Amino acid sequence: MTRSAPAWFAAARERISRGEAPVCVLGCGYVGLTLALECARAGSAVTGIETDEVRAKDLRAGANPVPDVLIPDGELAQLRDGGRLTFMTALDAPADVYVICVNTPLRDGSPDLRFVESAGESVARVLTEGAVVVLESTTYPGTTEELLRPILEEGTGLVAGRDFALAHSPERIDPGNRDWTMRNTPKVVGGLTPESTELVSAFYSRVCDNVVGVTSPRAAEITKLFENTYREVNIALANEMAITCHDFDIDPWEVLRAAATKPFGFTPFRPGPGVGGHCIPVDPQYLAWRVRGKVGRQFRLLETASDINQRMPSYVVQRAAEILNHEGKALRGANILLLGVSYKGGSGDVRESPALRVADRLVASGASVSFHDPHVPTASINGVVYDSQALDDAVLAGSDVVIVLTDHPDVDYARVLDRAPCVYDTRGVMERFDGSAPNLHRF
């Protein structure tokens, strides 16, 4: 017997498809703000909920407080004045579509879902029949059905799937990437019911060119974890191979370039000082935690890869000490300039940045540390706030070693190599220069 769609389904689908459904985005960081903007640009009336009062004030004033979200000057104010984009610190009115885009950090190695719970409770206070609720926050498989669903149902007396649509759609935003945007990056959607998947797919089809449906929220949740576990494992392999190449006195960057010429069966990943940011150091740990707790076993490959990547900052410090010793200097008391402290090139995001872990270890070892980063004006190192230094000749010449930790595109690396007495390149940015330069040490 074929199950019929809920009575409200057709009308909800029509409103969503025509852009007439009011949208509420909970959490206006780089994920939520990007989604809110795209929905408003597509003609929807959008309310962004941001509990950080300073950030919310900036957004209401038309200022962009999230540097990694690329917004043309004046657009926030234009959308606000046109009635399509409003920002508030609390949810106090119903919408047709609610999208939860809050942070899901780790706390003592375990998932911290307090922000998801709080957002769910906010939605439950105003949720009505026929609405759509989507969780975009990255989390372990089962969160949408086992954590969010009970909060919504118990707070309303409604039943997910019967009275409102519920789905998970993992965010795939790459901060600062101008080539792969929300519009051209495929969007995975997994609904609690086929109707939920259809409604949420209709919603995202207004802002995404390709929506990919899967059969459940759990499938969508683990898809995101698989993507980032794949990256962590392969980065760990590249790091372990780079260490091995150094042990054998082989240039790892030459090996990587040569291996990448194979047109099939090989995808190049670059070694570096570790992994950082909002995804790679965190998301795979959600999967490992869930496997241990739900199945009672280890995800051994993932946990080994994570261990390798977490040890890379210590390896960088060890290599820096060896390089200084080769120059007749000790790590303790050495003047070390760190080139870049954000976790990725072109970004000012320092969350989980391996560069800061390198800095902490250097300071703890007695080195005198400074840094230059064109995207990070200040950074906390071992509890002390440091200012980014100008990359002038005196700073370069006065350093015992310059350690390249972030591959920012807007740095004159040729000048760095020419002025600094010693350069340790952990990112391969000096590949295009003469590898025989006596002051250059490769990762």
Show which residues each predicted segment covers.
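Structural/interface elements that position substrates and couple domains in central-metabolism enzymes
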Residues: 2-443
